[in-house]
């Protein structure tokens, strides 16, 4: 998955290569590869949940469980990057997410991730996506 980034003049820490590597790990559906990019105290705010921020998952072990569960539930899931903008510490990425479930169903929707980085690791992943009705 390639980040089609617009460079921000303030960009010092975050690189397109790092964001692309995170995306590649997710697209490989490889939980160990994904988790190497998360800080131990990272948080993940899911798009859905009872709170304004959705359901919040705290800590790398909890986040690992969330994504491992996704990878186990589907044959594969792929995020196609539609656009990505970087600042010094944040990546704002638009995706087309397609999941092929083991029962033969395909799920597709548009999503946005806001990834906040510190020292080369994700400290906060905030996800938004379109709801079909």
Q: What residues fall within each predicted segment?
A:
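Short, low-complexity N-terminal intrinsically disordered segments enriched in polar/charged residues
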Residues: 1-40
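A beta-strand edge to alpha-helix "cap/lid" segment located at domain peripheries
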Residues: 6-14, 64, 68-133
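Residues at structural and domain junctions
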Residues: 8, 20, 28, 49-53, ...
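Generic signal for short, ordered secondary-structure residues
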Residues: 12-14, 20-21, 42, 46-49, ...
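Acidic side chains
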Residues: 27-32, 45, 113, 126
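A solvent-exposed, acidic/Ser-Thr-rich amphipathic alpha-helical stretch
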Residues: 31-82, 86-88
């Amino acid at each position: 998955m390639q980040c089609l980034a617009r460079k921000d003049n303030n960009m010092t820490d975050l690189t397109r290569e790092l964001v692309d590597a995170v995306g590649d790990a997710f697209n490989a559906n490889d939980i160990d590869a994904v988790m190497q990019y998360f800080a131990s105290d990272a948080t993940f705010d899911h798009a859905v949940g009872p709170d304004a921020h959705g359901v919040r998952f705290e800590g790398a072990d909890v986040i690992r469980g969330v994504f491992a569960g996704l990878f186990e539930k589907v044959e594969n899931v792929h995020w196609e990057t539609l656009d990505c903008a970087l600042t010094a510490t944040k990546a704002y990425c638009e995706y087309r997410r397609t999941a092929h479930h083991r029962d033969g169903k395909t799920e597709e929707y548009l999503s946005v991730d806001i990834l906040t980085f510190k020292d080369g690791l994700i400290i906060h992943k905030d996800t938004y996506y379109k709801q079909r009705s």
